[in-house]
Every structure is written in structure tokens, then in C-alpha cells.
Amino acid sequence: MLDLDHLRACILQRDEAALCREWLHPVEQEKLSSLRHQKRHLEWLGGRICVKEALRCFLKNSRHPAEVPAAHLQIIHAASGRPLVHQGVLNGDMVIPHISISHSGKYALAVAAAAPCGVDIQENRETLGRVQERFCSQVEGRLLMRFLPGLDSSEHLTLLWAAKESVKKAVLLESMPGFLELELRRIDLRHGPDHPGGLLFTFAFALGNQGKLSATTTHPAQFQALVCLDHGYGIALCLSSPSLFPGFHYA
């Protein structure tokens, strides 16, 4: 996870072009130069730095034959908008890692994994309450209040939004499921050194939308997101294979 304020300070202290040459593929440098809005420019750069670092960790732990410079890795996008790793300099025999990128407020976050994955970070904002009916059903609201009584409604919504976003990103369908097509069914506490203070949200496709899932046999009947609330941000990770939770790489 990268503090975008820190990134902004780094840009002010050194030549941004040099920073971009270190982290971005030439095609990505061209893309960044086209982003004129300062906030979008910073978020995009922060997301690319995060995902490159996550990829380098993944490749190192996958015994890739040589360390790959960040600038040699190129992130492209599928027609759906999903970020993908261009094979490029990667070993042709290895499975191309799956990636996911997110940013909100002052942070950017990314993950790389051997299976389809989704990551999301969401700042706790009052605007979520104004659009609550678009992503949180009454049943889900009651479930959150019942199992997380120590949190207020805005924190409930922040966690739910992040969790659903992570699941949407991890589901490999032609079109992402809608927020209300995913139903929160269960909340579990996660204990242990790998999940300090974490929560496990279990989702299922809403009744009547199961047909969307029948197009592929690679997805489980349920989806789980590891969720936490940290300094006013909801952070969520979904992997298509929950057994991979100990082995993912994020930055």
C-alpha cells in the first residue's frame, strides 16, 4: 500500500520523469503524460508502482529465472477494463499472475496472485450513506449490525463496499456482477498472525442471477473476502481460491 502524499513529496523532491523511467513501461509513460488532472495523475502512477512491486514479489517467490525491472513490466487492460500483465519479458512457461489495483483517498493498493483476485480500498465517506440502497440491502444492513455492533453505520457501509468491489474484480465474467447481485450471507472473525483483526465476508449470487455464473466452472458457489478497517479505510481482498490467502503478494 502506498501513501499518495508520500509519492507526491517524492515527485517534488526529484525529477518525475526519472521516477517514471524507473517504474513505468514506455507505453505506460505515454499514458501517464496524457492524464492532465493532478489527482488522477497521482492515483494512476501510485497504482502502477504498487502493482509493479507486487508483481516483482510474486515473480521472486515463483522462482522466475531473473529479476525483472519494474519498467520492463507492462500493465494492459482487457476489453472489460480488468488490468492484465502483458507477457513481454516473462518466462513463457510460467502462468501469468493475476493482478488487481485500487486507490481511494490518500492511498493506492495492489495485489498479484496465482488465481483471479480482487482488492479494494475505500475511504470512509458520508457519500456512501447517500447511495446505500444501491449496494446494501436491508437484510445485509441487519446482518452487519448484528455481527459488528461495535462499528457505526458508515463503517459497516465502508467495509461492505470494499468487500463487494473486491469480489466483483475477482469474478472472471464478461461483465462484473452488480452490487445487489452479491448477497452478504455470513461474517466470521479471522484470528491468528496472518489475519490480525480481520473479518471474512461470505457472499453468494442473489437469487435469480445464478445463470451468470453457469458460463464458467472455475468459480466457487460462494465468494469470500478478507476485510479489515484501518484508520478510516475499508480494505478487502478476494481470491477465487481461499486456500491461497497465505500466499498472495500485495503492495
Can you name each region flagged by the protein language model?
Residues 1-251:
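Core catalytic alpha/beta fold that binds nucleotide/phospho-ligands
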